[in-house]
Amino acid sequence: MTRKYRIAVLPGDGIGPEVMREAYKILNILKDDFSLPLEIKEFNIGGAAIDQEGVALPKKTLLGCENSDAILFGSVGGKKWDNLPINQRPERASLLPLRKHFNLFANLRPAQLYSELKNLSPLRSNIIKNGFNILCIRELTGGIYFGKPTGRLKKNNIEYAFDTEIYYNYEINRIAHLAFQLSQTRNYKVCSIDKSNVLNSSILWREIVKKVSKHYPDVHLSHLYIDNATMQIIKDPNQFDVLLCSNLFGDIISDECAMITGSIGMLPSASLNEKKFGLYEPAGGSAPDIEGKNIANPIAQILSLSMLVRYSMNLKKIADKIDQSVISVLKKGYRTADISNNNDYLKTNEMGDVIASALISGE
């Protein structure tokens, strides 16, 4: 009997359900036209779950995710729930617990400038003439966001605050191995970002990355300090392939990479654990300002599904076909509002339709 791939679908809030409907079109094609044995189950998450079940991450949802091979996530949050205590708000009470529960230590953020969308980038045309395709790999469960002690105190009428950057060798080791392995599916280049001229945690980071690199002699390793890296990305993004970053530095640099592509509505992301179980979601948020207007760009959600197929299902050729269907519609001039220079653009459902048609026809 053929093993089924079990996918937990969590549409969430804001534009999440709208763009997820378009991802469903691709999922149905994978089932019906590509004959993939998919078992798809949908669960509540975020504000929608608060409204219907009283909590942002219901036990039923968590159990459904545990019984799945991957999670396809929409978005959570919105003004409606901003009056709740911060730890009960959709973002804090659903997405973060999911990451922790499944030990999703690696965040993958591709930032690709498609040649058809060069006009959207804030960079000069001579800099981006060849486009760029960067994969930012961010360590997600360690570093200064989770280090102890942390706090805010007052002594002798002087107020002060402090945080602690801690990295254990195994945390750096596993994220480094993943970066080198993924670079071998791309252009065999890893640039590790640190601040080893100042920080002890970065000194350890660089030492371990160098040791790990010896297992991958075919991959070229370079190092940059975070301050120089932010400048180099603006100067020549095409020089980079895989960026390997700590939690804090990856948080900064992945958003910079996203910005220079011109539209966050195009960008997917993945968070993986050591078993390649993953949570896949658009890099943007719930965008409540455009909710219900049928103008959200579904491409990031569709490309998030492509990443799920690539990394959790290990079906590279099919993932490539999904990616190519997106490129095909962009080459034909189809645009959503966020990437259009005029009022001639497709609605959310229309963009989903043309991508689905391109996938079926193999364009």
Swiss-Prot record:
Co-factor binding details: Binds 1 Mg(2+) or Mn(2+) ion per subunit.
CC per GO annotation: cytosol
InterPro entries (alphabetical): IsoCit/isopropylmalate_DH_CS, IsoPropMal-DH-like_dom, Isopropylmalate_DH
Example GO biological process: L-leucine biosynthetic process
GO molecular function: 3-isopropylmalate dehydrogenase activity; magnesium ion binding; NAD binding
Major location (coarse): cytoplasm
Name of the protein in its database record: 3-isopropylmalate dehydrogenase
Compartment annotation: Cytoplasm
Record-listed NAD(+) binding positions: 78-91, 285-297
Originating species: Buchnera aphidicola subsp. Uroleucon aeneum
